[in-house]
Amino acid sequence: MANLKEIRNRITSVSSTMQITSAMKMVSAAKLKKAQDAITAMRPYAEKLTELLQNLSATLEGEVGGAFTAQREVKKVLIVAVTSNRGLCGAFNTNVIKQAKLVADSYAGKQVDIFAIGKKGNDVLRKTNNVIEVQNTIFDQLTFENASDIAQQLMDKFVAGDYDKIEIVYNEFKNAATQIVRTQQFLPLAPIVGGEVVASDYIFEPSKEEIVLTLIPKSLKTQLYKSIRDSFAAEHGARMTAMHKATDNATELRDQLKLTYNKARQAAITNEILEIVGGAEALNN
């Protein structure tokens, strides 16, 4: 059995760790509330934008979408992997990295590159895949404008023919304890074909076609922003859950160590009493 000093040191160490994990849990809980409010607020906008685009395109004849719907033979693929800059969030990053590798493996024989959003994904994926670009700073100021800049880079690469297909792998936020890994095709868009005519009393200027072609880049930027926002909220949810479990485990370990310490202390006192009694009896004899 370890001596009393060793047990006391372990109790002190575990207690310090417990204070850190508890503080991190509270910080993540506060950040989660803000991130959750942001993603909840933007989802109706993203859905309405998609609905508007579909309704307008349904009134048009033929195929609409221009370069963004160009269906080319897939030879070059870009995977956008959205992870975090920090760890201590359970399997949050690991799940995205695994899925990104699976998606890359599914394009065997083709050129597959990685666009890493988040330091953790870059650190791992660069060892086995070709990471062409890393974006770590967006989480410092997560705004639509900053996400739009990244989306514009991706659109430019596709339109220029650098890639025939672009996919996004990220964690979708459900609740604090649940994140779902999603693989979403970013480009090309599914061809927008005029179908059932949607009744509308709107007057369009300059034209429906031009409005649709303006909405498509806006929709793509919103799609990427939503994916990063989802991932950001999911990260804090995963970290809060992980730190909650770590705090519970540390509390349990500390209690076990205290029990062990008390037993060891009691045994030491008992031994001292026995030694004193034994010594007294020896003197009497």
Segments the model singles out, each with a brief description of its role:
Residues 1-285:
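C-terminal beta-strand-loop-alpha-helix "lid" module of Rossmann-like NAD(P)-dependent dehydrogenases
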